[in-house]
Design a protein with these regions (language model features):
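A short beta-strand-loop-beta hairpin characteristic of the jelly-roll/cupin
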Residues: 236-255
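Conserved metal-binding segment of the jelly-roll/cupin
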Residues: 252-266
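A short hydrophobic beta-strand segment most commonly corresponding to one strand
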Residues: 229-235, 260, 275-290
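Fe(II)/2-oxoglutarate oxygenase catalytic core
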Residues: 25, 29-209, 213-226, 239-242, ...
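Short beta-strand His + acidic residue motifs that chelate non-heme Fe in jelly-roll/DSBH
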Residues: 219-222, 243-245, 261, 267-273
Length: 293
């Protein structure tokens, strides 16, 4: 590492003898990585700073060259993401379920509404569902319990919103059991849920709820349990300043427009508005999984 760092600060020595500017950059990167891993004596710090400057200049030159080469081409999302990954502007996010991984599934953060024929009929019921939501909230201000709760049967979850009603839930199906009191007073919700291919797994699913996020609340980045499902949000109350990031992509909720995403990919959500956000949240089978599987 020291030998590379002793090169001409401009990179000229390495440029001439080790493969040009790109070669120089690789040597400087190697020296910087070695210094970061094992440390470097104080007298080398000025040279390491100059090496960092050289690498930064080289990276900007490469980016300018690349962007000039592809300028004028159609703006294709996958090309844009690939370019951002290459330039270090974006991180690579893959499925990392915390409990169960099913192999061979596409690495997709979001799915589009148009891919599912049941989505449009459910979206058409948004008005009736919002009316039920408003009625419940007016009648029972404390109807929503904290989404993340401490259980005497499990270790306390490591979540800053544990037992905090700023992220609230009102369940219609929980752990595979219908919550009759809520289902009975919200027939539009139950009719809408009947349209979707919701998993039926004893003790686990169906799972469906109104998910409430109060103003100023941030759900920290995390991964879901499984990659065999998609999480669906039917947005009901959607103030400005609210968004959902899944992997490298961030989308906003729009009332009556479904969001479908793979929650085994790192995701987070926030409400930076002064009003409450509410979605109807449920899960469906991944469409790539065969019935036999």
């Amino acid at each position: 590492g020291e030998g590379a760092a002793r090169a001409e600060p401009s990179g000229g020595m390495i440029d001439r003898g080790r493969g040009g500017a790109r070669g120089a950059t690789s040597w400087y990167r190697s020296a910087l990585a070695q210094a970061a891993a094992t440390g470097a004596p104080p007298q080398l710090q000025p040279l390491l700073h100059k090496a960092q400057d050289y690498v930064a200049r080289s990276s900007r030159t490469f980016e300018d060259h690349l962007m000039d080469a592809i300028s004028g081409l159609p703006a294709l999302p996958r090309i844009q993401l690939a370019t951002d990954l290459l330039l270090g502007k974006q991180s690579l996010f893959l499925q990392q379920p915390s409990m169960f991984y099913f192999p061979g599934l596409p690495q997709r953060a979001f799915y589009e509404r148009s891919e599912f024929d049941w989505v449009a009929p459910m979206e058409a019921m948004t008005g009736a569902i919002v009316a039920e939501l408003e009625q419940v909230r007016a009648q029972e201000a404390a109807a929503f319990a904290p989404y993340v709760q401490t259980s005497p049967l499990r270790p306390a979850p490591n979540n800053p919103l544990r037992d905090d009603d700023r992220w609230g839930a009102l369940y219609f199906w929980q752990n595979g059991e219908q919550v009759a009191a809520n289902a009975d007073r919200c027939p539009a919700v139950m009719a809408a849920l009947a349209l979707a291919p919701i998993p039926v797994i004893a003790g686990r699913s169906p799972m469906a709820l109104w998910s409430l996020l109060k103003p100023g609340t941030h759900i920290q980045p995390h991964h879901g349990l499984l990659n065999t499902r998609l999480i669906c949000h039917l947005p009901l109350l959607t103030p400005d300043g609210c968004a959902l990031r899944v992997g490298a992509e961030t989308r906003t909720w729009r009332t009556g427009e479904m969001l479908l995403f793979d929650d085994s990919i790192e995701h987070e959500a926030w409400n930076r508005s002064s009003d409450t956000r509410v979605v109807l949240l449920f899960e469906i089978w991944r469409p790539e999984i065969e019935a036999e599987e």
